[in-house]
Amino acid sequence: MSCARALAACCLWRLRTGALQPLSAYGRRISVRFCSSGMTLDNINREAVDRIIRVDHAGEYGANRIYAGQMAVLGRTSIGPVIQKMWDQEKDHLKKFNELMVAFRVRPTVLMPFWNVVGFALGAGTALLGKEGAMACTVAVEESIAHHYNNQIRTLMEKEPEKYEELLQVIKKFRDEELEHHDIGLEHDAELAPAYVVLKSVIQAGCKVAIYLSERL
């Protein structure tokens, strides 16, 4: 498919947190940019890219819901601005993956409504344990996401990395920001949370299940 035809098709729709809406001018530029740099719908491994974009979109959506839950409980406390800053970065991540979903015609996971509820509940629930509980959740989730992004980087590097240069740049940038969030959590007493090791292990086990399901459903 030519860039012009891909652009014409993409202009008909846009994804915002799982809903299809008309594509904005910004989304159109994203589609053209990827076409012009060599990463088109024709010359990529569609199955691999579909899985990567779908699961990353779901992960960033879930992260947004977690931070929303934390802010609902701790937004007016001293840790509120710290959580808000991390949440703002996660909003940028989600926006980018919304655009990539449109540009590469990737459907969202069918589990979006489930992650909506579970993410908020996890964020609010751990925040009810106090600042330390919220930060423990942040450490567990961000560590899992960073590890997941590293796996994706290795996968794309094995599949003619020059074709996926821009996608690799996005994933690497977001991986680094997730690691920053991880370190912020540790700096704000995550390890002082009640039953920290158990809590972290349970959350990370849930993250593994979420990644597995979101790639496939």
Curated annotation (Swiss-Prot):
Binds 2 iron ions per subunit. The keyword Oxidoreductase applies. Pathway: Cofactor biosynthesis; ubiquinone biosynthesis. It is a peripheral membrane protein. It is found in: Mitochondrion inner membrane. It catalyses: a 5-methoxy-2-methyl-3-(all-trans-polyprenyl)benzoquinone + NADH + O2 = a 3-demethylubiquinone + NAD(+) + H2O. Fe cation 1 binds at residues 60, 90, 93, 178. One of its GO terms (molecular function) is metal ion binding. One of its GO terms (cellular component) is ubiquinone biosynthesis complex. Component of a multi-subunit COQ enzyme complex. Interacts with COQ8B and COQ6. Interacts with COQ9. This is NADPH-dependent 3-demethoxyubiquinone 3-hydroxylase, mitochondrial.
